[in-house]
C-alpha cells in the first residue's frame, strides 16, 4: 500500500485549529454537515446516472447509513453516492475549495468567542468533525472507478492519503474517533434525535444501524420537503431545511413555498435570510438556489435560475417541464427556465412590496442587509425597473427616515415634478451639504443615496412613473421656482445673471481653467458657494469613482455657483462696484472651500493653508 503524507493548506490549518479548540455550544451541527455532504454526493451521482446508467449498476437505491461503535468510541457515516478518488480527497479535504469557507477565514478576529460564533454563521462542512473527534478517517471509491483510497488526519496540520486494498463498494465512509469529552454523542437516542431534528427533510433515506442486531432503522421521512403540502410542514421543519441548505444558524426572514400550475409547472421553496450573507458581494459568489427536475438534483452552479440581484435567496426550485437528461449547457438559454425565473422574480418582488408596507421596521433591516444587491438590478437591461424601484427605500433628508419613492412623490409640493437626490458616502455629511440647503429650506425633500451602485442606476433610470430623477448637484436647480412655470424661471434666471455679471466675471477671471463657468446660484440659501455640474455632465461622485478605478484620467472642471445673499459674496460684490478688486485670496479660498465640501481635491494645498492663515491673522489683528 502506497501512502503520502501532506500538509494542510494554511487556510485549512486555521479552520482545524478553531475546530479542535472550539467552544461553540452547538457542536451537534457536525452531524447535519456530514449528512448534508452525503446527500449531495448521492444527488450528484443520481444526476450523472441519467446519462450513464453504468455508474449505479447493481446499486441504484441511494442511502445514508449512520452507525455507532461504542466499544471503539466511533461514529460512522456511510453513503453510496459519487465517492472520491485520490485527487478529490486532496482537493475537497486538504484545501479550501469553497468561497464561503474563505470568507469564514477573512472574518476571524482572534477573539475566541467571536470566532466560535462564526462556526454557526458559515458552516464549515467536513471540518466540523474535529469539534467532536480527535481523529477522522475517510474511505472512498469513486463511481465508475475501481481504486479505493483512504484519508486520515488528527487535524493537527497533516493528513495521509493512501491506496487501499480492501473490498469497498462505491461511495464514502467517514469514521469519527470521538473525543473523551464528547462521548455523549455515542448515545443512540441522542444521535437519532439529532439526525431527525436536522435532516428529516433530506430526500435520501437515512438509516441507523443498530450495533447489536445490525438492523437498519430509517430515521427520516426521505421525502423532499418542498413536495409536501404546506399544511403538513411545521415552522421548525422549514427552519431546519433552511439552515441545512444555507449553512447558517439564523432563521429565515421570509419563507416562500409555492406550487405553480398551468403552462409551466414547478415548485419553489425559497428563503430570504434574516442576516446578511458574508459572500453577498464576493467576486466568486454563487447563487444558492438548487435546481431539481422531478425531484432529481441537477445543479446550483452556472444556471440562470434567479437574477443576480436576488442572489441572497436560498432554496430549491423543482421543475416538471424540463427533461431529466438535459445538459447543463442547454440550461444556459432555456425558455422554460427563463419563464420560471420571471415567475419567481415577480413572486419575490411582490412579497417584498407586501413586507415593505406591512412591516416597515423589519423591512428596513432587510434593506440594510440586501438593498445594495437589489439595486444592481436597476442597471440590468432585462429588469422591470419600475417594479424593482417600487421595493427600494432611501433615507429622506427632510424626515431622516427610510421612505420609498412612491412615498416621496405622495409628499410632492404643489407643482413639483422632480425627484431630487444627493449621493455620497455618509448620510450625515450629505445632510449638511450646501447642495440641498435651499431645497430643504423650502420643505422639498431630497433622497440620500449612499451605495456606490446608486451612481450607476440613476444613469439608466432618469425617471420614475413620469417624474424626472435629478441630482441636487445640477446647475439648473432653482428653489424659488421649483414648483412654478418654466418661463418664469428662465426670465428670473437671466435677470440674475445680468445683474451679477460683474461678480461672476471677476471670479472667472481669478479662477480661470479651475472652473468651467461661474453662475449665480438659485439653490443656496446660507453657504457662499458650491460646485455644480450641468445636466449633460457626469455627476460629481460618479466621476470621482471612475477616477479611483482608473477608468478616466482626471476630474473635469465644474461650475462654481455663488450665493449673492451670503455676507461674504455680498462684500466682494460691493467692493467690485466700488472698483475694489483686492479680494483674490478670498475668491480662491471660497473655491477651495467648495471643493472640500464636495470631496474634490484642492489644486494647491500649501497655498490654501497660507490663505487661511492670512485671513485668520487679519481677523485676530
Swiss-Prot record:
Keyword Transferase: no
Assembly and oligomerization: Homodimer.
Subcellular location: Cytoplasm
Transmembrane segments annotated in the record for this chain: none
GO function terms (MF aspect): ATP binding; ATP hydrolysis activity; ATP-dependent protein folding chaperone; unfolded protein binding
Disulfide bond positions: none
Name listed for the protein in its UniProt record: Chaperone protein HtpG
Chief localisation class: cytoplasm
Region (A): 1-328
Region described as B: spans on this chain: 329-544
HAMAP family hit by this protein: HSP90 (MF_00505)
PROSITE patterns: HSP90
Chain segments carrying region C: 545-621
Gene: htpG
Keywords tagged on the record: ATP-binding, Chaperone, Cytoplasm, Nucleotide-binding, Stress response
Upper taxonomic lineage: Bacteria, Pseudomonadati, Pseudomonadota, Alphaproteobacteria, Rickettsiales
Functional description taken from the UniProt entry: Molecular chaperone. Has ATPase activity.
Signal peptide: none
One cellular-component annotation, GO: cytoplasm
Membership in a protein family: Belongs to the heat shock protein 90 family.
Amino acid at each position: 500500500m502506497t501512502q503520502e503524507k501532506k500538509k494542510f493548506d494554511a487556510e485549512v490549518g486555521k479552520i482545524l485549529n478553531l475546530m479542535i479548540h472550539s467552544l461553540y455550544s452547538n457542536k451537534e451541527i457536525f452531524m447535519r454537515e456530514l449528512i448534508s455532504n452525503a446527500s449531495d454526493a448521492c444527488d450528484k451521482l443520481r444526476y450523472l446516472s441519467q446519462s450513464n446508467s453504468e455508474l449505479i449498476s447493481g446499486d441504484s437505491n441511494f442511502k445514508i447509513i449512520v452507525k455507532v461503535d461504542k466499544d471503539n468510541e466511533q461514529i460512522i457515516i456511510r453513503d453510496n453516492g459519487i465517492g472520491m478518488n485520490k485527487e478529490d480527497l486532496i482537493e475537497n479535504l486538504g484545501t479550501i475549495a469553497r468561497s464561503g469557507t474563505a470568507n469564514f477565514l477573512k472574518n476571524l478576529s482572534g477573539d475566541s468567542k467571536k470566532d466560535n460564533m462564526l462556526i454557526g454563521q458559515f458552516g464549515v462542512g467536513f471540518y466540523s468533525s474535529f469539534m467532536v473527534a480527535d481523529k477522522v478517517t475517510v474511505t472512498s471509491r469513486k463511481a465508475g472507478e475501481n481504486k479505493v483510497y483512504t484519508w486520515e488526519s488528527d487535524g493537527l496540520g497533516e493528513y495521509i492519503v493512501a491506496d487501499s486494498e480492501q473490498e469497498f463498494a462505491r461511495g464514502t465512509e467517514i469514521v469519527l474517533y470521538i473525543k473523551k469529552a464528547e462521548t455523549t454523542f455515542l448515545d443512540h437516542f441522542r444521535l437519532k434525535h439529532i439526525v431527525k431534528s436536522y435532516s428529516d427533510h433530506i430526500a435520501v433515506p437515512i438509516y441507523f444501524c443498530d450495533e447489536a442486531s445490525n438492523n437498519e432503522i430509517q430515521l427520516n421521512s426521505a421525502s423532499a420537503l418542498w413536495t409536501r403540502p404546506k399544511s403538513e410542514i411545521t415552522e421548525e421543519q422549514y427552519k431546519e431545511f433552511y439552515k441545512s441548505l444555507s449553512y447558517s444558524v439564523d432563521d429565515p426572514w421570509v419563507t416562500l413555498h409555492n406550487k405553480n400550475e398551468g403552462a409551466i409547472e414547478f415548485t419553489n421553496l425559497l428563503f430570504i435570510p434574516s442576516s446578511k450573507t458574508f459572500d453577498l458581494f464576493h467576486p466568486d459568489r454563487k447563487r444558492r438556489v438548487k435546481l431539481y427536475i422531478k425531484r432529481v438534483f441537477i445543479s446550483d452552479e452556472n444556471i440562470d435560475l434567479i437574477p443576480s440581484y436576488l442572489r441572497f435567496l436560498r432554496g430549491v426550485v423543482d421543475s416538471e417541464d424540463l427533461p431529466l437528461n438535459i445538459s447543463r449547457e442547454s440550461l444556459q438559454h432555456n425558455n422554460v427556465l427563463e419563464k420560471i425565473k420571471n415567475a419567481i422574480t415577480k413572486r419575490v418582488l411582490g412579497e417584498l412590496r407586501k413586507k415593505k408596507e406591512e412591516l416597515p421596521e423589519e423591512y428596513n433591516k432587510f434593506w440594510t442587509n440586501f438593498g445594495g444587491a437589489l439595486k444592481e438590478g436597476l442597471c440590468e437591461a432585462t429588469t422591470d425597473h419600475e417594479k424593482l424601484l417600487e421595493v427600494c427605500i432611501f433615507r429622506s433628508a427632510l424626515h431622516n427616515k427610510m421612505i420609498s419613492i412612491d412615498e416621496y412623490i405622495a409628499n410632492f409640493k404643489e407643482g413639483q415634478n422632480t425627484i431630487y437626490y444627493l449621493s455620497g458616502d455618509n448620510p450625515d455629511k450629505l445632510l449638511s451639504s450646501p447642495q440641498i440647503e435651499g431645497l430643504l429650506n423650502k420643505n422639498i425633500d431630497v433622497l440620500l443615496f449612499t451605495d456606490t451602485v446608486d451612481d450607476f442606476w440613476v444613469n439608466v433610470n432618469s425617471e420614475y412613473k413620469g417624474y424626472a430623477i435629478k441630482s441636487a448637484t445640477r446647475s439648473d436647480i432653482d428653489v424659488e421656482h421649483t414648483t412654478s412655470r418654466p418661463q418664469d424661471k428662465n426670465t428670473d434666471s437671466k435677470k440674475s445673471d445680468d445683474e451679477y455679471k460683474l461678480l461672476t466675471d471677476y471670479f472667472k477671471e481669478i479662477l480661470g481653467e479651475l472652473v468651467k463657468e461661474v453662475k449665480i446660484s438659485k439653490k443656496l440659501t446660507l453657504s457662499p458657494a458650491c460646485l455644480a455640474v450641468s445636466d449633460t455632465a457626469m455627476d460629481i461622485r460618479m466621476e470621482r469613482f471612475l477616477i479611483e478605478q482608473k477608468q478616466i484620467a482626471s476630474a473635469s472642471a465644474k461650475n462654481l455657483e455663488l450665493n449673492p445673499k451670503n455676507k461674504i459674496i455680498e462684500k466682494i460684490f460691493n467692493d467690485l462696484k466700488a472698483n475694489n478688486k483686492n479680494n483674490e485670496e478670498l475668491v480662491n479660498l471660497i473655491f477651495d472651500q467648495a471643493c472640500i465640501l464636495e470631496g474634490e481635491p484642492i489644486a494647491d494645498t500649501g497655498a490654501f493653508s497660507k490663505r487661511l492663515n492670512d485671513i485668520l491673522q487679519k481677523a485676530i489683528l
